[in-house]
Amino acid sequence: MSKTIAINAGSSSLKWQLYQMPEEAVLAQGIIERIGLKDSISTVKYDGKKEEQILDIHDHTEAVKILLNDLIHFGIIAAYDEITGVGHRVVAGGELFKESVVVNDKVLEQIEELSVLAPLHNPGAAAGIRAFRDILPDITSVCVFDTSFHTSMAKHTYLYPIPQKYYTDYKVRKYGAHGTSHKYVAQEAAKMLGRPLEELKLITAHIGNGVSITANYHGKSVDTSMGFTPLAGPMMGTRSGDIDPAIIPYLIEQDPELKDAADVVNMLNKKSGLSGVSGISSDMRDIEAGLQEDNPDAVLAYNIFIDRIKKCIGQYFAVLNGADALVFTAGMGENAPLMRQDVIGGLTWFGMDIDPEKNVFGYRGDISTPESKVKVLVISTDEELCIARDVERLKNTK
């Protein structure tokens, strides 16, 4: 038996989960926040307990040392050599990585070069990879890329209708994101439906603070809503989603606070979406509270959100020429029954109908009625388990 750590490292955080493999049992999980800042926080959950420490953690190497020491201190492992593999989530793999890979010096260098495609994510992932390689150099490190699942898209789908030199010279194209989540819930949907994935047409809706929707044909991604970056697609928690690109130079001309394109993109990424329109929050629970209070800005934000998601799902029915099931996953997808109800309410023409008694908070499974031609499923995503599985598969191929 072996133990594998799944890592999701950001610029100032390191989220982790420890598995017993191949049993896929979760032994512990936690997160280290505010890396590089004063009063960093390390949280460890195991055996029904929760331990929290306030520390000064200067970089990812210190964070990894604290994580490993905590595993021993709390008796979760007896020695480092019980850990046989580490899997790292990497947002952008570009066209270089069509599947998960074992890390070597060249892979790490390429991940850092691809930071231009995910400047908020890839540098943190690279820092986490370096830290584990420095501290545990003899164990297998594997990179699992958010974009890999979407490399099956056809060229006419992933290219933008701009001069091709921008793709040839600068690799401007649709890459997508959340691929690990979309892959996992599609596999789970096939099990739930009792049919081979290779026979199914699925639309998977990952609706959390980030939102992406994918058309899955026979187990492969044929289209997805996120694009060159995770800013594209429907409205999200703090991201605008798709807008007319001519808005960007217009805002630079009109608003003295927006000095250049980077300022506008920052606004579109961090100050837009549900948060920007409502002026309340990026959290759907706060938006729904605003609905109860008849807050007009909350109502407007909610209506735009529902409208954009319905439109995206509808276009993927056209891409797939129909679908066997629609899958909701991630924070809002799993835990916002009102949102699911209102999205489906605009898609009944496609033959979808949900059972109100099943469409409640906390329910997982098939929420459609027996008469529904298209099944509607709620499935909890598990990107960490996908990462651990890939480590188990690849760790003997070094």
Swiss-Prot record:
Tell me the InterPro entries matching this sequence: Ac/propionate_kinase (IPR004372), Aliphatic_acid_kin_short-chain (IPR000890), Aliphatic_acid_kinase_CS (IPR023865), ATPase_NBD (IPR043129)
Site label Transition state stabilizer, positions? H178, R239
- Residues binding Mg(2+) are N8, E383
Q: Which reaction does it catalyse?
A: acetate + ATP = acetyl phosphate + ADP
Q: Which domain of life is it from?
A: Bacteria
Entry note: cofactor = Mg(2+). Can also accept Mn(2+).
Residues that hold substrate according to the record = R89
Protein residues bound to ATP: K15, H206, I207, G208, N209, G210, D283, M284, R285, G331, M332, G333, E334, N335
Q: Which GO terms describe its biological process?
A: acetate metabolic process; acetyl-CoA biosynthetic process
Its required cofactor(s), as named, are: Mg(2+); Mn(2+)
Q: What class of enzyme is it?
A: transferase
Q: Where is the active site?
A: D146 (proton donor/acceptor)
The protein's location, in the record's own words, is: Cytoplasm
Q: Name one GO cellular component term.
A: cytoplasm
Give the function comment from the record: Catalyzes the formation of acetyl phosphate from acetate and ATP. Can also catalyze the reverse reaction.
Give the family from UniProt. Belongs to the acetokinase family.
Which proteins does it associate with, and in what oligomeric form?
A: Homodimer.
Which NCBIfam families does the protein's record reference?
ackA
What's this protein's name? Acetate kinase
The top of its lineage is: Bacteria, Bacillati, Bacillota, Bacilli, Lactobacillales
